[in-house]
Design a protein with these regions (language model features):
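Rossmann-like NAD(P)(H) cofactor-binding subdomain of soluble oxidoreductases
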Residues: 11-12, 21, 29-104, 108
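Small-residue helix-packing motif on alpha-helices
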Residues: 4, 14, 32, 168-175
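NAD(P)-binding Rossmann-fold cofactor-contacting core
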Residues: 1-18
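Conserved beta-strand segments of alpha/beta enzyme cores
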Residues: 3, 22-24, 85, 127
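Mobile acidic interaction elements
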Residues: 6-7, 11, 25, 124, ...
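Short acidic-hydrophobic, aromatic-tinged amphipathic segments that line or gate anion-handling sites
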Residues: 24-29, 130-131
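Internal alpha-helical scaffold of NAD(P)-dependent oxidoreductase catalytic cores
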Residues: 76-85, 101-139, 150-177
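Aromatic-residue-lined binding/catalytic grooves and analogous aromatic/hydrophobic interfacial grooves
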Residues: 147
Length: 177
């Protein structure tokens, strides 16, 4: 954590993140980009354009840009960042508890060492699956991205139904799981 810089335009949120996890904090995306070996873009797709514009021209040659933004294609990332060493990834919701699977792909500029870094970073959320063609990213997003949330929602509804029928919540959970 002492080598990680979190960039957030909201100082209170960024400072809290820094204090909670022992990270360095900056409000400047360009400052983070200039210092990064690996720059993780973990923002909503609708703000990605603004974020990419703020780092364009600030990335060091050979640094890795790792995107976790849904639906943002590698060409868009490369053009927007002015950089070619790009990984696009799509984690799913169970990754929040380390039980997910993240599908990822990268450009030919990504070195073997950077591929290993990617596996290590994304592996913190569970399993990883590398695909060599970006077309599989969109397919995986449809299949895997939010799909598990619907399964959990259905499980919660079944548990509620069990409670409604007279089971304790604990017993209903055991029956459903």
């Amino acid at each position: 954590p002492d080598r990680i810089i979190a960039a957030d335009p909201h100082e209170d949120r960024g400072r809290q993140l820094g204090e909670s996890y022992g990270l360095h904090f900056t409000r400047s995306n360009s400052e983070a980009a200039e210092a990064a070996d690996v720059l993780v873009l973990s923002v909503k797709p609708q703000v990605m354009g603004k974020v990419m514009a703020s780092i364009k021209g600030h990335l060091r040659p050979g640094s890795l840009v790792l995107s976790i933004a849904a639906g943002v294609r590698i060409k868009v990332l490369s053009d927007g960042c002015g950089h070619n060493c790009i990984v696009r990834s799509m984690p799913n919701t169970p990754g929040q508890i380390g039980q997910g699977i993240t599908v990822w792909t990268g450009t030919s500029d990504v070195s073997d060492e950077q591929r290993q870094w990617t596996e290590d970073i994304l592996g913190a959320m569970g399993e990883t699956l590398y695909v060599d063609d970006e077309k599989f990213m969109d397919m995986a997003t449809a299949l895997n991205g939010s799909g598990p949330s619907y399964v959990f929602l259905l499980m919660e509804a079944l548990i509620d139904a069990g409670v409604h029928l007279g089971f304790s919540r604990q017993d209903a959970q055991r029956l459903v799981q």
